[in-house]
């Protein structure tokens, strides 16, 4: 049997080793395989090798890929294509199927890796880790030619099993090293007693590690320290709090903070924010509000509610007693103005008083009861007349002045002229009689024009006085809007803050402690602003009352002025006509012009200015004393009064006052006419009929005075005036030094005997006056004797003779 088997083996071997006489070419084989595939005999996929001389099935390719991976653990698809001699495309397809069928395999970046491969790699990594205590993932990735993310994915499931270490911040650490770092972090955290920035702590630990191990020491990332610290904090190993992940505040420090804040606040009932900032509390206001919900957070400090209670009690007493209080005087010194304002806003008694109009707050901290303010107002109202308020001329709007020009009330009667002038009345006669010479010379003609005196002209500026008053209501309608817009400004002009403050300090000196008025929001300034409308209302009421009372007084005042002006204007026009006679004698003409300006013009101007000044005051609601005292004004007084008059009237009045210092009476009359028209007064013109009547009355009165005159000195100017009237039919007023020139002018106008006696009388009178001036008090003096002798001659010889001549001529 064995021999037969051996024989069969030899025959098989011979058959196998024998060469066929017929061989198939490669082309034939390819065609044969295609025929078999077409007929379905070969029903599976055949793959060509890269050489093209061999066929391989997909299953066989998969098998060879598995065997290669099993042998190597990690294989690149490119390497498998070269090793197996199969196109890379087919290798990729079959590799994907292999990986899909075997979960222990993975295909990453063109490489197939098995779990066994990673187990082997991680074992090697663990060995290196134990040797070095730390390995960087970047180093592992570089050695394995893979990405760091893949290294992490491979290592994480094997940490604690194959790899004995901890992965943190891209580093692998051994447990012993982690424990050592944990101890360092724990010690550092517990050693810190003040708020500290954690990165700076980690930097210090890194420097310490480098000093311990040198340049070759293990490098530890700050994130590793932070991770360990977070774990310790979570476990409660270290106590404290972390803000923003980097600012560490130890519990011991927070505890010390709370104790310090509580101690300060409980002892002082307040605490400043700067105290908390020194304690390293970053948001002091929020901290205190959370710590003490009942406390009050102010701008600079945090206070206990008891501070409000204390101030509320003080404010309540102040309001109840009708006084004022500065909250800063009650509150502790550490509370400033803005904080005092907020505390006041929290006082119930003050808020209740404000709602019921019992108190008001001025400035940041001053509380005034309305009773106190009313007390000040009442005293100021009583003293309002001492404020020195005057009214803007023509506008009816008052303004304050520091000093007011004060002159006596009414000027003297316009009919009272210089008694030394020709035609002047005797000082010894009664007032009514004295007025007849110059003031009443118009006689019956004035009586006939009584109706005209009561009328006011309506043309041009003559209607100014009444039309202005009548149009005030219309102006109020059209200008009401503008007036309302300017009310505040007008109030300020009437009662300036400085004036009110000065008066307030006068009646309430205790308010001086509030300081000056530089601060526009200061308590004293605000109090003055509060009082201003009250004072304005009181002033307006008083002014309106005074206006209604003054209306009748104004009418009487202006009517009286008009009557006196009518009389004076007619007299001045009458006397002005005599000036034409002396135009050829400039020296005498100048004397007569100045004499009329002084004796007749000045009293008229004084009366007009004083009356218009008084009328302006009455028109604006100011009180004026009624006085008939005659006052002679100086040039400065006239200018001052004229400037106080309103608008264009002031200009005209100043021009009128200036003409008194001039040399022409006609210029004065023109200025007087302009002023009268501007003020609404009537300026009567002297017509022929009135002139004849006045000259007739003047002649009659002057004749009576010459007839009854017994004083030889006073007799001369009267008789000269009478002779001048007889010669030229003109009324004359001349000073004593112009009598000689007048007598010389009469030489050719009167009879020679009369002229001779008149000239003799004049020369004797001049000598008497000269001797009288030279005489001494000694009655035996020779000059006195000669004076008495010549005066006796005047009385006994010349005066009777001259009377006879003049009166005889007058009667004729």
Curated annotation (Swiss-Prot):
Molecular function per GO: UFM1 ligase activity; UFM1 transferase activity
Enzyme Commission (EC) number: 2.3.2.-
Origin: domain of life: Eukaryota
Key words, A-Z: Transferase, Ubl conjugation pathway
Feature: compositional bias, Basic and acidic residues: 403-415, 475-491
Task performed by this protein: E3 UFM1-protein ligase that mediates ufmylation of target proteins.
Record-given protein name: E3 UFM1-protein ligase 1 homolog
InterPro entries per the UniProt record, alphabetical: Ufl1, Ufl1-like_C, Ufl1_dom, Ufl1_N
Family to which the UniProt record says this protein belongs: Belongs to the UFL1 family.
Stretches the record annotates as Disordered: 389-495
GO cellular component, one term: endoplasmic reticulum membrane
PANTHER family: E3 UFM1-PROTEIN LIGASE 1 (PTHR31057:SF0)
A family per Pfam: E3_UFM1_ligase
GO biological process: protein ufmylation; response to endoplasmic reticulum stress; reticulophagy
């Amino acid at each position: 049997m064995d021999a037969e088997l051996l024989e069969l083996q030899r025959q098989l071997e011979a058959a196998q080793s024998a060469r066929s006489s017929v061989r198939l070419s490669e082309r034939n084989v390819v065609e044969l395989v295609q025929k078999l595939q077409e007929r379905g005999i070969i029903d599976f996929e055949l793959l060509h090798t890269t050489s093209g001389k061999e066929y391989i099935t997909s299953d066989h390719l998969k098998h060879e890929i598995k065997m290669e991976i099993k042998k190597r653990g990690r294989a690149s698809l490119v390497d498998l294509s070269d090793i197996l001699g199969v196109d890379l495309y087919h290798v990729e397809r079959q590799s994907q199927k292999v990986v899909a069928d075997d979960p222990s395999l993975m295909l990453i970046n063109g490489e197939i890796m098995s779990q066994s491969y990673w187990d082997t790699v991680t074992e090697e990594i663990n060995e290196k880790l134990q040797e070095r205590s730390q390995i960087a993932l970047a180093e592992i990735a570089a050695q394995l030619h893979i990405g760091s993310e893949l290294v992490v994915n491979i290592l994480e499931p094997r940490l604690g099993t194959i790899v004995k270490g901890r992965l943190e911040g891209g580093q692998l650490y051994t447990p012993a090293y982690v424990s050592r770092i944990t101890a360092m972090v724990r010690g550092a955290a517990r050693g810190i007693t003040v708020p500290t920035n954690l990165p700076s702590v980690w930097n210090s630990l890194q420097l310490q590690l480098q000093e311990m191990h040198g340049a070759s020491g293990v490098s530890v990332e700050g994130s590793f320290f932070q991770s360990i610290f977070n774990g310790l904090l979570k476990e409660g190993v270290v106590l404290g709090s972390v803000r923003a992940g980097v600012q560490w505040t130890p519990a011991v420090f927070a505890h010390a903070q709370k104790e310090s804040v509580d101690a300060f606040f409980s002892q002082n009932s307040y605490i400043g924010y700067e105290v908390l900032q020194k304690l390293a509390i970053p948001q002091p206001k929020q901290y205190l509000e959370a710590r003490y919900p009942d406390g009050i957070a102010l701008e600079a400090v945090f206070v206990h509610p008891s501070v409000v209670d204390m101030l509320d009690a003080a404010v309540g007493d102040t309001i109840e007693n009708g006084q004022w209080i500065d909250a800063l005087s009650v509150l502790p010194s550490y509370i400033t103005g803005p904080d005092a304002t907020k505390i006041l806003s929290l006082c119930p008694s003050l808020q209740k008083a404000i709602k019921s109009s019992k108190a008001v707050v001025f400035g940041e901290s001053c509380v005034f009861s309305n009773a106190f303010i009313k007390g000040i107002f009442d005293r100021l109202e009583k003293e309002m007349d001492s404020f020195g308020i005057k009214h803007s001329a023509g506008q009816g709007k008052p303004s304050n002045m520091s000093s007011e020009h004060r002159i006596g009330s009414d000027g003297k009667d316009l009919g009272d002229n210089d008694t030394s002038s020709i035609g002047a009345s005797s000082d010894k006669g009664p007032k009514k009689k004295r007025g007849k010479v110059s003031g009443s010379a118009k006689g019956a003609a004035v009586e006939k024009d009584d109706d005209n005196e009561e009328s006011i002209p309506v043309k041009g500026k003559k209607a100014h006085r009444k039309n202005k008053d009548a149009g005030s209501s219309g102006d109020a309608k059209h200008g009401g809007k503008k007036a309302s817009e300017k009310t505040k400004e007008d109030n300020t002009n009437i009662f300036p803050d400085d004036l009110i403050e000065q008066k307030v300090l006068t009646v309430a000196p205790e308010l001086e402690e509030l300081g000056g008025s530089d601060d526009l929001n200061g308590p004293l300034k605000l109090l003055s602003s509060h009082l201003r409308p009250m004072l304005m209302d009181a002033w307006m009421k008083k002014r309106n009352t005074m206006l209604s009372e003054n209306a009748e007084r104004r009418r009487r005042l202006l009517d009286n002025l008009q009557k006196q002006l009518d009389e004076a204007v007619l007299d001045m026009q009458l006397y002005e006509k005599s000036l034409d006679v002396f135009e050829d004698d400039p020296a005498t003409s100048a004397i007569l012009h100045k004499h009329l300006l002084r004796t007749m013009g000045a009293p008229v101007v004084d009366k007009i200015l004083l009356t218009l000044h008084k009328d302006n005051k009455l028109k604006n609601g100011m009180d004026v004393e009624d006085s008939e005292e005659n006052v002679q004004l100086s040039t400065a007084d006239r200018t001052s009064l004229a400037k106080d008059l309103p608008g264009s009237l002031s200009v005209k009045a100043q021009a009128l006052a200036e003409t008194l210092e001039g040399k022409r009476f006609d210029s004065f009359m023109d200025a007087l006419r302009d002023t009268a028209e501007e003020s609404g007064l009537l300026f009567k013109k002297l017509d022929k009929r009135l002139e004849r009547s006045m000259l007739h009355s003047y002649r009659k009165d002057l004749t009576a005075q010459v007839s009854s005159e017994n004083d030889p000195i006073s007799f001369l100017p009267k008789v000269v005036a009478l002779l001048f009237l007889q010669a030229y039919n003109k009324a004359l007023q001349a000073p004593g030094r112009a009598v000689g020139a007048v007598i010389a002018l009469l030489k050719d106008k009167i009879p020679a005997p009369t002229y001779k006696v008149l000239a003799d009388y004049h020369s004797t009178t001049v000598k008497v006056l000269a001797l009288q001036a030279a005489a001494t008090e000694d009655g035996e003096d020779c000059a006195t004797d000669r004076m008495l002798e010549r005066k006796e001659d005047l009385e006994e010889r010349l005066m009777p003779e001259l009377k006879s001549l003049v009166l005889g001529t007058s009667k004729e």
